[in-house]
Design a protein with these regions (language model features):
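N-terminal carbohydrate-binding/catalytic regions of secreted carbohydrate-active enzymes
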Residues: 34-107
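Mid-to-C-terminal alpha-helical segments outside catalytic/metal-binding sites
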Residues: 1-32, 41, 45-60, 64, ...
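Catalytic pocket-lining loop regions of alpha/beta-barrel enzymes
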Residues: 6, 13, 108, 154, ...
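Active-site gating/metal-coordination segments in enzymes
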Residues: 4-22, 77-195
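Acidic-and-aromatic substrate-binding clefts and catalytic sites of carbohydrate-active enzymes
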Residues: 37-45, 69-72, 90-96, 122-130, ...
Length: 348
């Protein structure tokens, strides 16, 4: 969720071509991780999104809202515009999915086809959460392409959010995972691998693995490989490689902070990540993780070029387009398949 200046965006304005980043990547991309509302549930709208996609060479986009909204507390004179703007809490906000669905429906049919919307506006610790998913699919049967981004363990945001701590293996999510399997829908999860103060081992990774192992028919996408602000562990690429080798139903997206911190630090691709990407390119996609601010899509995606340039043609095509299209593109307008009763293992 970029809300700060990333050093790979810095350009020497005196050089020719300094406006090139505004045009996005030289490779056409499916942006597989794009929030179209902010933390106060405001959106620039569908026309602004399509315009920005065209300017940034984004052919299609996987879009979703935000499942939480920032409270404007009585003691705060200035309205917050981000979850870190002040110390006020966040609360779950189900209407975010309606905002996304109506944004899509407001566009011409040809532009709607470029968008793969996901549903995310449920409380992941509420065992009634499945009902929200079912209602939204029934209300907008021609819209959804998957579920997510489900915000689970998320450093400061976890502390700000009302209620029980969300986690990938919470019992409230198991019926949703089963629903996703029955309808062949991918599930995008934000699950930090560890806490801010535990950077020597992945404290929370077992929660993700338990869910992924319990639902082998559900396709999970591990958002930005489990990294967040101040969240890191040694040998990160080895951990990701082990996960992809062990769980064939697990995918990852390269987005937000992981790219600049470990994949391509200081704008120099790490050879270990290049090798991992070549090996598992069919399970990796790229995303901006922008929270609205569509005008920044170009620079955000442009910075991937230095990494993409060093991949084989096949791996590059998978990251830029094929993996995301395989995950999300085949599900559009197919959400009304018959649902099988969800009976997770822990209830049998």
């Amino acid at each position: 969720m970029p809300h700060e200046q990333i050093r790979t965006w810095t350009r020497k304005t005196g050089l020719r071509g300094s406006l090139t980043p505004l045009k996005g990547s030289k490779y056409q991309i499916i942006d597989s991780h794009l929030h179209v509302v902010n933390f106060t549930q405001e959106t620039p709208g569908g026309e602004a999104l399509i315009y920005a996609m065209d300017q940034a060479n984004i052919g299609r986009a996987v879009i979703f809202g935000l499942p939480v909204s920032k409270l404007w507390a009585a003691g705060e004179r200035e309205a917050p515009d981000y979850y870190l703007a002040n110390d006020a809490p966040c609360y779950y906000y189900g209407y975010t999915d309606v905002i996304v669905a109506e944004l899509v429906r407001s566009l011409p049919a040809a532009q709607q086809e470029r968008l793969y919307p996901l549903i995310c506006g449920f409380n992941p610790v509420d065992r009634y959460a499945l009902r929200h998913v079912e209602r939204l699919y029934a209300q907008y049967p021609d819209v959804w392409s998957g579920i997510g981004e489900v915000l689970l363990r998320h450093d400061d945001l976890t502390a700000f959010t009302y209620g029980e701590t969300a986690r990938a293996n919470h019992p409230a999510l198991y019926p949703i995972y089963q629903f996703a399997a029955d309808h062949n829908l991918p599930v995008l999860l934000h699950q930090n691998i560890t806490s801010v103060t535990k950077n020597d081992h992945p404290v929370y990774l077992w929660e993700l693995e338990e869910a992924v192992a319990e639902y082998p028919r559900t396709r999970f996408i591990f958002a930005h490989c489990g990294m967040s602000r101040r969240v890191n562990v040694p040998f990160y690429y080895q951990m990701v490689e082990r996960l992809l080798a062990q769980y064939p139903n697990l995918y990852v997206d390269y987005s937000w902070i992981i790219y600049d911190v470990v994949i391509c630090p200081d704008g120099k691709p790490d050879p270990n990540w290049l090798a991992l990407t070549e090996k598992y390119s069919e399970r990796i996609c790229l995303g901006s993780d922008m929270v609205t601010k569509f005008e920044r899509l170009g620079p955000e995606l442009f910075r991937y070029d230095v990494f993409l340039d060093q991949l084989s043609d096949k791996a590059r095509a998978n990251l830029c387009w094929n993996t995301a299209e395989k995950l999300y593109g085949g599900n559009k307008n197919r959400v009304m398949q018959e649902q099988v009763a969800a009976i997770p293992a822990w209830q049998r």
